[in-house]
Design a protein with these regions (language model features):
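Signature for HUH/AEP ssDNA processing cores
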Residues: 2-132, 142-145, 156-157, 169-214
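Elongated alpha-helical scaffolds
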Residues: 137-140
Length: 214
């Protein structure tokens, strides 16, 4: 069933190429269509007319989704509770602080930073969009964001919880207003805190040039 925030997600798709693991691209790089195989700006849907390419894309995507789900569940004290929540169509509650910290950025800054990091071919770990709060959440390695002081962003405390849908929930879908912009692929790869800070700072500076005040 379409999410009530679908219109918002359509706008995001128009701005961003959907980010996902693929046979020809590293995690978070923009080289081939995502799981829905949509013809988004910058994609090459004609390649999918080749049955072999289509099959490889589907197999790689399915494998990454399964691996990402298992990785997230393994970060919880009771992995079965994570899968039970997903099977019930709910958000799973996974503790932060041990395996990652969460950097939260207001949506305009966060989306711009995602685009900038991909354009620079920097690795992106899992990224969530929380539409109801207008926030983008980045998973970063614990201890890599000490002294964070960038306006428009916050670093959650180590005791916070990640509320996340199953990794297959991507635009144009959402669960309780949350969707993955970059779903986990099971490798455990996270966003580098320093590179994320640079991308967010650049996004903020660019916004200031056009008069945005965040």
């Amino acid at each position: 069933m379409p999410d009530p925030d679908g219109a918002d997600l359509q706008g995001i798709e128009r701005r961003m190429y959907f980010l996902t693991p693929s046979p020809t691209a590293g995690h978070g790089q923009m080289k081939s269509p995502g799981p829905r195989l949509a013809a988004l700006p910058g994609s090459r849907p004609e390649r999918l007319s080749d049955p072999r390419v289509l099959r490889e894309a589907l197999e790689a995507t399915a494998g990454a989704i399964v691996n990402g789900a298992e990785w997230l569940a393994s970060c919880a004290s009771v992995p079965a509770d994570v899968f039970a929540a997903w099977n019930g169509g709910r958000l799973a509650h996974v503790p932060a602080g041990v395996n990652w910290q969460i950097v939260r950025a207001i949506k305009p800054l966060g989306l711009d930073a995602v685009v900038r990091m991909c354009a620079s071919k920097h690795h992106l770990g899992p990224v969530l969009l929380t539409m109801r709060d207008g926030v983008v959440e980045f998973l970063v390695a614990p201890g890599t964001v000490d002294g964070w002081d960038l306006p428009g962003t916050t670093v959650d405390s180590l005791s916070r919880t990640l509320y996340c849908p199953h990794p297959h929930v991507v635009p144009l879908r959402a669960v309780e207003g949350r969707t993955w912009l970059v779903p986990p692929d099971g490798t455990g790869g996270l966003t580098d805190g320093d590179l994320l800070y640079e991308a967010l700072a650049a996004a903020r500076a660019a916004a200031a040039v056009v008069g945005a005040t965040w």
